[in-house]
């Protein structure tokens, strides 16, 4: 869970648009019952700390469909603020220069 959370947060600051408060659009595939309940914990924590979570769920494929959607958004120049990413895929995105630096001290782990 920790690695998945870190991957999710890795894109948290990639948006170049300015905003008044902490607001993130999160692309993810946690849509089934237990997954959605786990994600709700993250959403609620973010909201409790003054953030606004914009949900972008992508169903199906165990994350494969979400990865296709993420690639399309990046290519179009419109990446989400954060994305759930599997394992070493985050390294591939980093090598392409599309991962913004993040600060683990901002994450309550």
Question: Where are each of the predicted segments found?
Answer:
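Sec-dependent N-terminal signal peptides
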Residues: 4-14
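Short, well-ordered beta-strand elements
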Residues: 22-31, 53-58, 81-82
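Short, polar/charged alpha-helical segment
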Residues: 33-54
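Pocket-flanking alpha-helical
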Residues: 36, 40, 61-101
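Conserved small/polar residues in nucleotide/adenosyl-binding loops
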Residues: 107-109
């Amino acid at each position: 869970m920790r690695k998945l959370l870190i991957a999710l947060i890795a894109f948290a600051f990639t948006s170049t648009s300015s905003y008044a408060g902490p607001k993130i659009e999160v692309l993810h595939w946690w849509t089934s019952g237990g997954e959605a309940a786990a994600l709700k914990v993250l959403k609620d924590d973010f909201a409790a700390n003054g953030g606004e979570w914009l949900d972008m769920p992508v169903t199906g494929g165990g994350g494969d469909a979400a990865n296709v959607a993420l690639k399309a958004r990046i290519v179009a120049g419109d990446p989400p603020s954060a994305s759930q990413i599997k394992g070493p895929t985050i390294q591939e995105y980093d090598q392409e220069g599309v991962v913004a630096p993040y600060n683990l001290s901002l994450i309550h782990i």
